[in-house]
Curated annotation (Swiss-Prot):
Annotated knockout phenotype: RNAi-mediated knockdown in neurons causes a reduction in sensitivity to ethanol intoxication.
Ranges where the record places region Disordered: 29-152
Localization per record: Nucleus
Compositionally biased region (Acidic residues): 99-152
Protein's organism: Drosophila melanogaster (Fruit fly)
Main location: nucleus
Record keywords, A-Z: Nucleus
Name by which UniProt lists this protein: Bacchus
Length: 152
């Protein structure tokens, strides 16, 4: 073997060794995660088995309190009623009343015909002649004489 080939082979072996080490590290990591998940599942099962409905009232209350997650208030999800001031309520009512009057005025303008658009803009002249379209009865080979042109 030449020196270059030997060096290349040694490099390839080193790369393969690093890759094998990485694979074994990943496998070990997956095994550790699986073991941790198994322990968590076993702890959950033990907690469920501890209180299978046979405990007396008040017994294992500490265990139940520890197992139940604490309720935390989430800010911004609900607005307390005290936060709304009387002035804001009055302002909303006044705005709603003003909005109704604007809508009524718009409806009156439509009904009365007050429009900013001139009617001449929609007059389209027709330069062609109107042709009367007549149906030819020549192709009524299947006419049974009943007067109905429905196809059967």
């Amino acid at each position: 073997m030449s020196a270059a080939t030997e060096q290349q082979n040694n490099g390839d072996v080193a790369v393969e060794k690093v890759a094998a080490d990485d694979v074994s590290a990943v496998k070990d990591d997956l095994k550790a995660k699986a073991a941790a998940e198994d322990k968590a599942a076993a702890a959950d099962a033990a907690g469920d088995a501890a209180d299978n409905g046979t405990s007396k009232d008040g017994e294992d209350a500490a265990d139940a309190a520890a197992a139940a997650p604490a309720k935390e208030s989430v800010k911004g999800t609900k607005r307390p009623a005290e936060a709304k001031s009387a002035e804001s309520k009055k302002a909303k009512k006044a705005a709603a009343a003003d909005g109704d009057s604007d809508e009524e005025e718009a409806l009156e303008e439509i009904i009365e015909g007050d429009s900013e658009i001139e009617s001449d803009e929609y007059d389209i002249p027709y330069d062609g002649e109107e042709d009367d379209i007549e149906c030819d009865d020549d192709d009524d080979d299947n006419d049974d004489g009943s007067g109905s042109d429905d196809q059967a």
